[in-house]
Amino acid sequence: MTARRAPAVNRDVLEQMLVEGTAALDLTLTDAQRNQLLDYVALLGKWNAVYNLTAIRDPKQMLIQHILDSLSIVPHLRGRTSARVLDVGSGGGLPGIVLAIVEPGWQVTLNDIVQKKSAFQTQMRAELKLVNLSVVTGRVESLQPGVEVPEKFDMIVSRAFADLSDFVKLARHLVAPGGSIWAMKGVHPDDEIARLPEGSHVKQTIRLAVPMLDAERHLFEVAVDDAN
């Protein structure tokens, strides 16, 4: 039995979708940034069979469900010309690679426990020439500032890592003073919020509108007392 091939899609079609999507999000990208994002989609599709990065194989759906979904959080994270960002459970590099492309002033670190996914992330750093991107393999709860990572982070993000309460428990020791944990979720996770550990609380809840995606999406900013 042969693997099902992804449908071929003209790059111009994807570029037009990206232009329309970023306009809907009120984001302005340079030509170079658009090309990097389109190259990333192509590379994600090319290496997906080897690294098992995503169940989505249609390039159009990759653009919508991965790129535009990741871009939808950018307006809410902006406000810093420089920031240290950790993407936990990054997998194929989402949202971290997208953040590194559109915010070159940020230092973005991708984290995953699976070595082959870290290998793909490292390859993307080289192919997309992302000098502001780094990769660290290992369990987030085992990462120590000054050892596995240089220092604590202003923003710790996750797109599909874990239950919100578990995410906070595992990553809170890496939040810099004044920093926050940012979790991307689908439907509003009332039960997960109710189980947030002591010394943490939801600072803001944002209903995301992802262009061309008819699905409920939320972004949660969680503050932790440890970071004060």
UniProtKB/Swiss-Prot annotation:
Q: What is its EC number?
A: 2.1.1.170
Q: Which GO terms describe its cellular component?
A: cytosol
Question: Which subcellular locations apply to this protein?
Answer: Cytoplasm
Q: Where does S-adenosyl-L-methionine bind?
A: 89, 94, 140-141, 159
Q: What GO molecular function annotation could you give as one example from this UniProt entry?
A: rRNA (guanine-N7-)-methyltransferase activity
Entries under SUPFAM superfamilies matching the protein: S-adenosyl-L-methionine-dependent methyltransferases
Q: Which UniProt keywords apply?
A: Cytoplasm, Methyltransferase, rRNA processing, S-adenosyl-L-methionine, Transferase
Catalyses: guanosine(527) in 16S rRNA + S-adenosyl-L-methionine = N(7)-methylguanosine(527) in 16S rRNA + S-adenosyl-L-homocysteine
> In which broad location class does this protein mainly occur, judging by the first location in its UniProt entry?
cytoplasm
UniProt xrefs under InterPro entries: rRNA_ssu_MeTfrase_G (IPR003682), SAM-dependent_MTases_sf (IPR029063)
Job description of the protein: Specifically methylates the N7 position of guanine in position 527 of 16S rRNA.
Q: Which HAMAP family match?
A: 16SrRNA_methyltr_G (MF_00074)
Q: State the similarity comment.
A: Belongs to the methyltransferase superfamily. RNA methyltransferase RsmG family.
Q: Which NCBIfam families match?
A: rsmG_gidB
Name used for this protein in its record = Ribosomal RNA small subunit methyltransferase G
Q: Which organism is it from?
A: Burkholderia cenocepacia (strain ATCC BAA-245 / DSM 16553 / LMG 16656 / NCTC 13227 / J2315 / CF5610)
